A protein has these predicted regions:
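N-lobe entry segment of adenylate-forming
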Residues: 3-75, 79-94, 98, 164
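Structural core segment of the AMP-binding/adenylate-forming
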Residues: 6, 10-15, 93, 121-189, ...
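Flexible, low-complexity linker/hinge segments
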Residues: 37-46, 182-203
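Conserved AMP-binding
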Residues: 106-109, 116, 130, 249-257, ...
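A short helix-loop-beta submotif of the ANL/AMP-binding
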Residues: 109-134, 144-156, 244-245, 263-273, ...
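Conserved AMP-binding/adenylation subdomain of ANL enzymes
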Residues: 228-245, 255-297, 308, 312-314
């Protein structure tokens, strides 16, 4: 997997005047358990939707932490499936057709995962866009988004309030059906038409390369390709079992983050704990703290992450 994203990690909370909101913990939230009630299966499914249908029967899921190590959101796979199914009808209510591309600014939060799987159930194709703006690089980031929107032929776009102005500016001259925040899509009326049953030969998502040496190249991933890769990672590469727990700070728009820490845990029915990439860059110790706190058994990163810990983390 390419490691080009490491050159673009941002540690600021404001870019070109747009504030990227940081979630605050208001109520006590319990993390999903490590022990699952469902028998472990090593991604022996035909499609991602079949994998989520199975994972949803257990109690495991995804958890999201602030830079201070406090959990601010938790989403079981059962809740994810239910919410993704509901959202899939709302996306189809826009008049989107099977095979249409939906651009998702891939921040490390539950909304990206909800929309990614909603697209799977609706027969739409999610395209993960980078959520990474270097300070003073407003124009360059907008240009990058515009090129990705054009290259992917996206018909709708989703971004948080912090990133929406960039995405709207990038889509100004494009014929897109809707570009808005997640809440606006959730508020749409649903379409009650039967959902498309995903087939192994259907396109699941489009993954763009890092583009560290040239403009990012889109790779079309079909369900059968994704599942073969995931099964190899889970069964042969990581040799996972039902007692594992994962932890990651890698961005969702990067292949190692999307495949390794969004798709793998769900297809293995294990819980995962997330720390935002920006928060890791500011507080690398938190990666180590959270692995200890959650008793994670699996976490990996490019060499940059270990180097940052070695340089910035000092014994207490």
């Amino acid at each position: 997997m390419s490691h080009g994203f490491l050159l673009h990690i941002c540690v600021g909370a404001q870019f070109a005047g747009y504030e990227v909101n940081v979630s605050q913990v208001q109520v006590e939230i319990n993390a999903t358990p490590t022990v699952n009630s469902q028998p472990f299966r090593a991604a022996d499914f035909a499609t991602l939707t079949e994998a989520l249908d199975y994972a949803a029967k257990g109690a495991t899921g995804s958890n999201f932490y602030t830079g201070r190590g406090a959990i601010y959101a938790s989403l079981t796979y059962g809740e994810l499936r239910e919410q993704a199914l509901e959202l899939s009808h709302k996306l189809l209510g826009l008049g989107l057709n099977r095979g249409d591309r939906v651009a998702l600014v891939a921040e490390t939060n539950p909304e990206f995962i909800r929309f990614f799987y909603a697209c799977q159930y609706a027969g739409l194709i999610p395209v993960a866009l980078p959520a990474s703006v270097k300070v003073g690089a407003h124009a360059a980031y907008v240009a990058q988004l515009k090129q990705l929107l054009q290259a992917s032929d996206a018909v709708a776009g989703v971004a948080s309030e912090g990133y929406l102005p960039f995405l709207q500016e990038a889509s100004e001259d494009l014929s897109m059906r809707m570009v808005d925040v997640p809440e606006a899509f959730h508020a749409l009326p649903g379409d009650e038409q039967p959902l498309h049953q995903a087939r192994p030969e259907d396109i699941s998502y489009i993954q763009y390369t890092s583009g560290s040496t040239r403009f990012p190249r889109g790779v079309v991933i079909k369900h059968h390709t994704a599942m073969a890769n995931l099964q190899a990672i889970i069964a042969d590469g990581l040799k996972m079992n039902g007692k594992d727990r994962m932890m990651s700070w890698l961005p969702f728009y990067h292949d190692m983050g999307l495949v390794g820490f969004v798709l793998v845990p769900m297809c293995a029915q294990v819980s995962i704990d997330y720390l935002d990439t920006r928060e890791f860059a500011m507080r690398p110790r938190q990666w180590l703290n959270l692995m200890t706190q959650t008793r994670a058994t699996i976490s990996f990163a490019p060499s940059f992450g270990y180097d940052l810990c070695a340089r910035r983390v000092r014994p207490k």
